[in-house]
Amino acid sequence: MSFFDKIFKKFHMGVLYFAVILIGATFIYCYFTKHEKKDNNTFDALAQKNEIEKIQYNPIFANSAFCDIVVTTTDGRVIDFFNIPYDKVFEKKPNGKYKYNTYSVDPRPWNGYEHVFWVFRQCLTMLFFYCFFLFFADTIKQMGQEILASTSGKKGAKSRKVIINHKRFTFSDVAGADEEKEEMSELIDFLKNPRKYAAMGARIPKGVLLYGPPGTGKTLLAKAVAGEAGVPFFAASGSDFDEVYVGVGASRVRDLFKEAQLAAPCIVFIDEIEAVARKRGSNIGGSNGSEQTLNQLLVEMDGFNQKMGVIVIAATNQPEVLDSAILRPGRFDRHFNITLPNVKDREAILKLHASNKKLSEEISLEELAKQTPGFSGAQLEGTLNEAALLAARRNATFINKKDISEALDRILIGPTKKSKKYNDKEKRMVAYHEAGHAVIGIKIPFAQIVQKITIIPRGNAGGYNLMLPQEETFFSSKKALLAQITSFLGGRVAEELMFDDVSNGAYNDFKHATQIAKLMVTKYGMSDLGPVQYSGNTFQNDFSDPKGLEIDQQIQKIIANCYQQAKQIIQENQDLLDTIAKYLLEIETLNKRDIDEIVATGKIAWWEKEKEETNAPTQTTSQMSSNNETTNTDKTPLNDELEITTNLDNQESNESNPNNNEKASPEVLSTDSEQT
């Protein structure tokens, strides 16, 4: 909109406001005039009672059948009547005389003021409607332009333009991903010195595809490249090109690249590109709008309409669904797998996000990085942010270890369910279930290290074991996979041995154990069937029915062998199982230091000391005389009620167990507390 258009629009709005004010003033003047205003029935009543002394009339329009009259009554009142029919005023009798001949009917003389006022009022009304029409038309025009822009993609393309300054976001703001940074530095050099590569006859990669799990920093890397090079950065998502109208997506692609060409050299970043670049031919009935959009994107990247100086960076979590035409050299020349950070990268990410947070000296980011294998950069940032929120909630000045531990639990499992309270039987069942997992993790070779055990309900879990691998590896051996299956089955084995009954708490345990066993048989070649892969789905398999029976038998064999091994280990370490379950019932949460102390000494020194200090005043008050009585006071009432025994015949049958669906992973073995 030009300067004169803005002035003209403001003038129209000013006239409209002025007209509204004048019309309002006119109506107020007419309302407070000294003349009374009555309806037609009042006029008839006055005429029939012979109370009219004089009538003065004004015709509304020429040759009109109605007129406005001013009636003067016999008592001196002056009354205005509007739109009175002429026949009613000048009605005649059969003898030719007026029906109401007791009053005089004369034309009302108009003075100059009234003429001017009447003309002004009519002009003002017309001006009001004219300005209102202009205002309404301008509004409709703006709405139409917005609809047209949304369907044509022009407005969306403009809104996607973001200028990234190299001083605002660079590689120093992205922790980890050193190899990807080194590879993408070539793009930065091209954007800064394009003639250098043109002189050598080299063609810079036109597109870079970043793929990997969510939260690994794909978008941040693209922004950092633009920031390092100091070039315009056009950001869009795949859904921006998706529209109900066929052809709109292709139009938006053209508009985006047209604007990028004007700003070249520049970077066009398309996030979640799988929304627009899926494999063609999957839609029944032929081509559709999404395929037209993909075709236009292919042409813009490497076709007759290819743009020079425009580098496309795309990100996706599903590279396997992308069309092969867009992955070929000349379009996306470079494919970078942005993996989950290793321990070194996790420490760097934690240091970056902890730079603006107040951490206590007891917190070691190196140790925290070792405790978070499999965490993405987004999860690490969320952990520190959650810890900061917890510290602020309790009005603390620093973030301590307890805040970090609680934040990890919230990220992995969820918040604490304080409203859920176990009864004694449920609590014992959950304690022994989690203790069974822990015993397997402690005693079996190649198992993951137990870091934490808790029976506090959290999220959908009634309790869980946090286990970490002994070291980060890129492969899993057969012994390690069998150890994982055995660990998953430890909870069910402990229930069976201690209660002579089982609960549905091992639902997820069996699910994950079966998945691992199936992969070992059908994908990894780790069974008696040999090094062969078998694939299929619910509707079709690439193996015969007899072979499917053999696969099922091999899976059952692996599960059965691991179950027997878990039962043997727990029976051989019954005392360790009872001790862990006992302290879980008392403390509810055990960390790695507590677990190591139980394995080494059979007790937790700090807890026993705390119990002695708590029971000491009770012993003095009761004045116990014998050593046996003093020893008995060291056991709390909770221990009396929940004393653990190995006599299965004396265990109570657990008829109303919680639905402890375990949410397990290589890092977490959890017991779901939701009821079925």
From Swiss-Prot:
Residues 34-115 are extracellular. Disulfide bonds: none annotated. Binds 1 zinc ion per subunit. Residues 610-676 are annotated as: Disordered. The active site is at residue 434. Zn(2+) binds at residues 433, 437, 509. Residues 1-12, 137-676 are cytoplasmic. It is a multi-pass membrane protein. One of its GO terms (molecular function) is metalloendopeptidase activity. Its cofactor is Zn(2+). GO terms for biological process: protein catabolic process; proteolysis. PANTHER family: ATP-DEPENDENT ZINC METALLOPROTEASE YME1L1, METALLOPROTEASE M41 FTSH. Homohexamer. This is ATP-dependent zinc metalloprotease FtsH. It comes from Aster yellows witches'-broom phytoplasma (strain AYWB). The gene is ftsH.
